[in-house]
Structure formats: C-alpha cells, structure tokens
C-alpha cells in the first residue's frame, strides 16, 4: 500500500510501444556488458567472493562441534538472519566510504579469515554457534558490498533489468562453491570444507585483482567513454 503514495521514477528506456521499449532494454544491457567497467563487474559477479556458500552446509558438519539440532536450527536460522541484517547495514555504510569493488574484495577476505579461524577453534557447541553467527555477520557485509557494486554500475536506463541480470549471474558462484565445499568435506572432513571455502574465496580475490589491473591498463589506452 505504501507504494501507492510514491511517484514512479521516469524510465529512460520506455517508449510508446512494447517492441521499442524491449529494444532499448536490450541496448542498455549490451552497452553494460561491452564496456570495460561493466564487463569487469560482470566478471566479478562470477567469482566466489563472499558468497557465504558454507551456510548451506553447516548441518553437515555440526556433529564435529557436538552441536545439537536445536543449536544448529537457532544459530543457522533466526539468529543468522538477524546478525546478517546488522552486517548488511554496517557493510553498506563502509561501502559508501571506500571504493565499492575494493570493499567487496576486502569483505570476502575477512570472511575467508573467519572461516579459517573456525577451523582452528575448539570443537565445542559454543564455538560452533559463535562462528556460524560470525560467518553470517560478515556475509551480510559481503552482500551489502555486492548491492553497492551493482547499483553503482547499472546506471539509470533499464536499471531493473540490469540489476536482475547481475544478481542472477551472482548465483552461479553460490552454486559451484557449494559443490566445491562439499567435495572438500567429502575428502578432508569439516576442516576440508572450511579451508576449501576460504582458499577458493582468496583465489577469487586474487584473480579479480589481476583482471582489474589489466582492465585499468586497457581503460587508460581506450577512447573516452569506454
């Protein structure tokens, strides 16, 4: 109901006919993906940085920390949701203070460090709850930085479509990292899951830094507006 009292912003891609509007949406998306900046962000969305994939596997390793079913449900359910909201708010604030892609990578590295710390921590139920909540808290930071990067990149034309395009692509690393984390667990146990999650995240940041440096070199020699 609240939306009824808000004025709808102008849609720059919209024309008098549907086909014209769709054509403009296609051009907007194409222009996003064919610029160096847009392609770099598209690539970033494909990387396993700060995706929080281990959250889907906590129940598989809870026994290693002697955590009860109730503790797992509480920590990985309501409490994780609450702390991730707080993380999103703080992470969004920080993302406005520094370069947003830098914030995204930085938060991803912090998440990897927390994952390693969990692997090294004592195997008790209390430690399980603490680190599950810490993981959710930092993942909130990562999701806020993700949103900041997307909103910074999409511009005004066909913003909803471009936002959903990048958001959809960002689900790819969540899927494949969950599979890779599961393989780490099957091969090396709980620590294998945690170290795999952390190592892949760090590798993703390193890969993005390398590609970003190359992109900046290309941008410095490209015509204005690219």
List the predicted regions and their residue ranges:
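Helix-to-loop junctions at the C-terminal end of transmembrane segments
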Residues: 87-100, 185-186
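Juxtamembrane intracellular "pre-TM" segments in multi-pass secondary transporters
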Residues: 8-40
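C-terminal membrane-cytosol helix-exit motif in multi-pass small-molecule transporters
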Residues: 1-13, 207-212
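A late C-terminal transmembrane helix in Major Facilitator Superfamily
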Residues: 157-187
């Amino acid at each position: 109901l609240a939306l009824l009292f808000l004025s709808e912003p102008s849609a720059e891609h919209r024309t008098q006919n549907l086909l014209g509007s769709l054509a403009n949406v296609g051009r907007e998306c194409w222009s996003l993906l064919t610029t160096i900046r847009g392609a770099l962000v598209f690539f970033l969305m494909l990387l396993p940085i700060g995706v929080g994939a281990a959250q889907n596997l906590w129940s598989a390793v809870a026994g290693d920390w002697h955590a009860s079913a109730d503790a797992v449900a509480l920590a990985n359910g309501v409490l994780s949701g609450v702390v991730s909201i707080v993380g999103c708010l703080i992470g969004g604030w920080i993302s406005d203070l520094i370069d947003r892609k830098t914030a995204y990578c930085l938060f991803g590295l912090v998440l990897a460090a927390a994952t390693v710390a969990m692997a090294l921590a004592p195997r008790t139920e209390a430690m399980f709850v603490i680190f599950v909540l810490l993981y959710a808290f930092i993942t909130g930071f990562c999701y806020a930085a993700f949103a900041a990067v997307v909103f910074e990149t999409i511009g005004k034309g066909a913003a909803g479509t471009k936002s959903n395009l990048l958001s959809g692509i960002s689900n790819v690393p969540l899927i494949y990292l969950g599979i890779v984390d599961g393989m780490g667990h099957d091969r090396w146990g709980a620590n294998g899951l945690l170290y795999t999650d952390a190592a892949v995240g760090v590798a993703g940041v390193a890969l993005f830094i390398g590609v970003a440096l190359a992109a900046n070199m290309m941008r410095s020699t490209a015509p204005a507006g690219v």
